[in-house]
């Protein structure tokens, strides 16, 4: 597989350089191996072709190859679980829902909203859904890279929005090439901030480490470049199963938006540093030039961060190397003593490639139903097998895991503080600046921010 395949299949987070950092045990002393429950699992991904004749025809034509299907992202709305599958030759549909039907590999996938969107010859369908996100207004946002095999641009990159109540397409926005400057659709991350149904911001990152901001109100795009988004290539090795990868490009992945502080957290896959920027400054950035302040937290994490998500109470949950999930509460200062481990499992947490926090408990699986306010949804795979393209189709290779957030952090350092508010957060946050480095001066010194606004040529309905 190519370097991009290695990078993108695991969302740029599989190439973790495990340097022997020690992740502390959970402060509660509880057993961490079973804190996450298995909701769905697959030996390989298969699809609901309606009948066996259709499946056999897809296999014979090369439309479907069970060894080429790798899930990249997961999200859930009521009883629908969405699964994004990166498009390689042999992937019949990139955007799917998990059906009630079961095949030999696991639950069958159904193209969403139907098979017509899985066809892309005329560029009206979805080529490769790299990231998906569901907002508070019951809309599914889909970032389509337009690439096949991660290298072949078939169509322009696009942003789709679907009404989940009707499964109707609300908007299909072509991302202009002068905004996605690579011209190859190499867009790799997606986060949505919906102030209301019209005033919605969509944050994306391209493979040149540039933040692209889409404003739903007027269908405009603009770019923000910063050296915090631009990391040099490192030589790094993944010691899991003796797998070694060298000279893999650093990219920005795993963005997470806090509903408490409105901070947008991000990091490069080989970095132990965490960066963040407040989205209020991003909203003003189009007109205010360099008035965007980026913060960097360094020397806090024992190993590299992977994907992450933030709860409604400000608990940042994130993956680390060594098969663990950890947490930090935004109401506390960001230092080592306030970070805790909430899950560890060498099998199910070998590599977490997607993480979401949802408001309703899934309809299947063993997730605790006693508190229905929030639960963690995580997608994991067998890292070394995916990277080496040698999946053992007799073993479980992909899993969707879940846990009630309150149960997950109970008795940990991240347990919610009901008597704390954002003022207390700001006080502690300011105290933590000794471990945070403001990059605003560096931005001005290096003149490394570039802005570009563009009105896109969109095809969309007027009811959005």
UniProtKB/Swiss-Prot annotation:
Disulfide bond positions: none
SUPFAM superfamilies on file: NHL repeat
Region of interest: Disordered: 419-464
Lineage: Eukaryota, Metazoa, Ecdysozoa, Arthropoda, Hexapoda
Coiled coil: none
Domain of life: Eukaryota
Family label: Belongs to the major royal jelly protein family.
Cellular localization per UniProt: Secreted
Gene3D superfamilies (UniProt xref): TolB, C-terminal domain
Biased composition (Basic residues): 426-435
Induction behaviour: Unlike other major royal jelly proteins, not down-regulated by the ecdysteroid 20-hydroxyecdysone (ecdysterone or 20E).
Tissue: Found in and secreted from the hypopharyngeal glands of the worker honey bee (at protein level); expression peaks at 4 days post eclosion. Expressed in the brains of adult worker bees peaking at 12 days post eclosion (at protein level). Expressed in the spermatheca of adult queen bees (at protein level); Expression levels are higher in mated queens than in virgin queens. Expression in the head of forager worker bees is lower than in the heads of nurse worker bees.
Function field: Component of royal jelly, a substance produced in the hypopharyngeal gland containing proteins, free amino acids, fatty acids, sugars and other nutrients, which is fed to developing larvae by worker nurse bees. Major royal jelly proteins (MRJPs) are high in essential amino acids and probably have a nutritional function in larval food. All larvae are fed some royal jelly (also known as worker jelly) early in their development but it forms the principal source of nutrition for larvae destined to become queen bees.
Keywords: Glycoprotein, Secreted, Signal
Bias kind Low complexity: ranges: 438-447
Organism whose genome encodes this protein: Apis mellifera
Glycan-carrying positions: 26, 31, 79, 149, 165, 242, 322, 368
One Gene Ontology cellular component: extracellular region
Signal peptide interval: 1-15
Name the UniProt record assigns to this protein: Major royal jelly protein 4
